[in-house]
């Protein structure tokens, strides 16, 4: 995992792996087939997948197979992982009130230059130019297309003043 200068904390591969392992152990990383605990003859507990008959019974009750309800993340798990702070990922106990800004400089608390923000406007996600703009004079054109899409001829010389 590479860390950028925008990251507030230091992320190492070991710490992220342990975090992912914790999520997997908590059962929120993958959807699981419902399991049932059963006792063997010697008294040991084992986990057993539900039989097809039980799965059919669940399906008849309106429960879809392969569907697991949204699992809430334990608040203690979030408190333990506070060190993973990043502008792209935020682990929080509360739902966000609004979508995050694209860049940190778009936040009004970070950027108090309102005149610059009004002048430049906010950047928009996913908007990229399809071609590079070019600012130079073109002198060898004899025809062009105007803003309404009509073909027009380009004058090579414009005479001004009394003719």
From Swiss-Prot:
Location, primary (coarse class): secreted
This protein's record includes keyword Membrane: no
SMART domains: NGF
GO terms of biological process kind: cell surface receptor protein tyrosine kinase signaling pathway; modulation of chemical synaptic transmission; negative regulation of neuron apoptotic process; nerve development; nerve growth factor signaling pathway; neuron projection morphogenesis
Subcellular location: Secreted
Annotated glycosylation sites: 112
Entry keyword Cell division: no
Molecular function GO terms recorded: growth factor activity; nerve growth factor receptor binding
Signal sequence residues: 1-3
Family annotation (InterPro entries): Cystine-knot_cytokine, Nerve_growth_factor-like, Nerve_growth_factor-rel, Neurotrophin-3, NTF3_N
Source taxon at top rank: Eukaryota
Keywords: Cleavage on pair of basic residues, Glycoprotein, Growth factor, Secreted, Signal
Gene Ontology, cellular component aspect: axon; dendrite; extracellular space; synaptic vesicle
Function: Seems to promote the survival of visceral and proprioceptive sensory neurons.
Name this polypeptide is given: Neurotrophin-3
């Amino acid at each position: 995992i590479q860390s950028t200068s925008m990251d507030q904390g230091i992320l190492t591969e070991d710490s992220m792996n342990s975090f992912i392992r914790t999520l997997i152990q908590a059962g929120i990383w993958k959807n699981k087939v419902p399991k049932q605990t059963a006792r063997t003859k010697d008294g040991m507990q084992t986990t057993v997948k539900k039989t097809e008959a039980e799965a059919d019974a669940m399906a008849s009750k309106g429960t879809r197979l392969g569907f697991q309800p949204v699992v809430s993340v334990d608040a203690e798990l979030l408190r333990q992982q506070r060190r993973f702070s990043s502008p792209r990922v935020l682990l929080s106990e509360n739902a966000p009130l609004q979508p995050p800004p694209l860049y940190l400089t778009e936040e009004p608390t970070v950027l108090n230059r309102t005149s610059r923000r009004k002048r430049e406007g906010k950047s928009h996600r996913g908007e990229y130019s399809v071609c590079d703009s070019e600012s130079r004079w073109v002198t060898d054109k004899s025809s062009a297309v105007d803003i309404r899409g009509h073909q027009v001829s380009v004058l090579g010389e414009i005479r001004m003043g009394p003719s």
